[in-house]
Amino acid sequence: MSKSTTVLITGANKGIGLGMAKAYLSRPNHIVICSVRSAKTDVTDLEAASKASGSKLLLVYIESTSKTDPAKAVEDVQAAGVDHLDVLIANAGGMPEGNKPLLELGPDELCWSVQVNAAAPLLVLQAFKPLLQKADAPRFAVISSTSGSIEHMKNIHSFIFPGYGAAKATLNWLTMGVHLSQEWLTTLVIHPGLVQSEPGNWVAKQIGMAEAPTTIEQAAEGVIKALTNATRESVGGKFLSTSDGTVLPW
């Protein structure tokens, strides 16, 4: 009997998170753990996803501003029989409401964005570390954005999304720190492209596009392809654009 590959995806009820969940569930022998905000979150599409032989879906609840949800999620998956975690994809995130200009951005909006986009992924990693350490080749990826690239700011004018961009830059810093300090773990930062999700299409319109160029299915497959055989030597510590395979500047 084949050993199951266990994957955790945060923010998996919509957008690229849902796309990745569906793609993993369509592969045989995958336990796909999907985190959503709460029991009130609509998970109809997740539960309806086709499942290959030996694959199954587990739901856990992680609200990105909660300090205790990640630890409770670990307890829940262990109670369901999960004894290791092969892949952790920190996908959940968000943009501050209103997207205020840089010189109008208040501390509350900035702190909220850093909590949701940077601190929350770190808390999830901290909680699931023991299960990752039981995997043969554990991998940790964060879904970031070119908005978090300081070098790219002058080219793409990402300062028009100050709360989001600053938080993603913080996420990038933390993830590089994980790569350098945790030599047992393959860690990378992923930019999946400008994706046809609700926030992706909103961003596209802000820069004069009718819609984002990358479909959810393309983005999901790009991330999964990058992670399937990822090693520290091949992608560890890199800021990888999975839509075209390029390595992005920090």
From Swiss-Prot:
SUPFAM superfamilies: NAD(P)-binding Rossmann-fold domains
Pfam families: adh_short
Reported induction: Expression is increased in rice-extract medium (REM) and is correlated with the production of pyriculol.
Annotated organism of origin: Pyricularia oryzae (strain 70-15 / ATCC MYA-4617 / FGSC 8958)
The protein's name in its UniProt record: Short-chain dehydrogenase RED3
This protein's pathway: Polyketide biosynthesis
A GO molecular function held by the record: oxidoreductase activity
Keywords tagged on the record: NADP, Oxidoreductase
Function: Short-chain dehydrogenase; part of the gene cluster that mediates the biosynthesis of pyriculol and pyriculariol, two heptaketides that induce lesion formation upon application on rice leaves but are dispensable for pathogenicity. The highly reducing polyketide synthase synthesizes the heptaketide backbone of pyriculol and pyriculariol. Pyriculol and pyriculariol contain several hydroxyl moieties and double bonds, so it can be assumed that several reduction steps occur during biosynthesis.
Active site: 145 (proton donor), 164 (proton donor), 168 (lowers pka of active site tyr)
GO cellular component: cytoplasm
Enzyme Commission number, as recorded: 1.1.1.-
Binding of NADP(+), residues: 16, 35, 63, 91, 164, 168, 195, 197
